[in-house]
Amino acid sequence: MTALKTTETIPLYTIRDLPIHGFRNMAQFVDYLFAGERVETGTLVAINAEKVLTAEKDVALRTLLDRAEYKYADGISIVRSIRRKYPQADVTRIAGADLWEALMERAGKEGTPVFLVGGKPDVLAQTEAKLRAQWNVNIVGSQDGYFAPEQRDALFERIRASGAQFVTVAMGSPRQEILMRDCRHHYPDALYMGVGGTYDVFTGHVKRAPLVWQNLGLEWLYRLLSQPSRIFRQFKLLKYVAYHYSGRL
């Protein structure tokens, strides 16, 4: 049974048996998460074609996704599939990196306590400094991504003791989803978000596609041209293309 939260205003769309929230725009998503007296609790997970395919073969990942309350369309292919399957759908792509920045800006305005996990030590330090300078974010703790498995419980206790209401984890999938799942068992009173390489992008260590490429839905192509080694990952996505055009969504 899925733990996905349902509301009258935010529709759910199902792609390959995976329910996904369909948001009209970024502002609606941010307002939805901050609609109460404090930010919502639960787990945010970005959904793209690669993750859909992986979840079909990886039972553990599928279980993690089923338990996440807020699954949103991060990949343009997911948005196009939703529109194909549900012609009246008013849904847009919500890029995880952009959502993270929008939530951090809102957290700064609201005074929401934030805990950052993941990234290299220097990148994490730069991320903290920029968040404080740019949006006055209330960062109550942090931990880089280089810690031993036996240190996990101590990290979970630090997060709990900090009183953080928003925890972001930059460790890549599925490591970040596993960490968030386990941390929520220890401390459920926060919103958790897996952000992959967002800290690197935010601090300028990794360059995103120009805005025109993003608006055309070609960010994947820009990444491929920048990192030719990704070609093998792109070949795997041909299976999703077949799902899309055959209507097996």
UniProtKB/Swiss-Prot annotation:
InterPro entries: UDP-ManNAcA_Trfase_WecG, WecG_TagA_CpsF. This is UDP-N-acetyl-D-mannosaminuronic acid transferase. Its EC number is 2.4.1.180. The lineage of its organism: Bacteria, Pseudomonadati, Pseudomonadota, Gammaproteobacteria, Enterobacterales. It catalyses: UDP-N-acetyl-alpha-D-mannosaminouronate + N-acetyl-alpha-D-glucosaminyl-di-trans,octa-cis-undecaprenyl diphosphate = beta-D-ManNAcA-(1->4)-alpha-D-GlcNAc-di-trans,octa-cis-undecaprenyl diphosphate + UDP + H(+). GO terms for molecular function: lipopolysaccharide N-acetylmannosaminouronosyltransferase activity. It comes from Pectobacterium carotovorum subsp. carotovorum (strain PC1). One of its GO terms (biological process) is enterobacterial common antigen biosynthetic process. Keywords: Glycosyltransferase, Transferase. It comes from the Bacteria. Pathway: Bacterial outer membrane biogenesis; enterobacterial common antigen biosynthesis. CDD domains: Glyco_transf_WecG_TagA. Pfam families: Glyco_tran_WecG. It is an enzyme of class 2 (transferase).
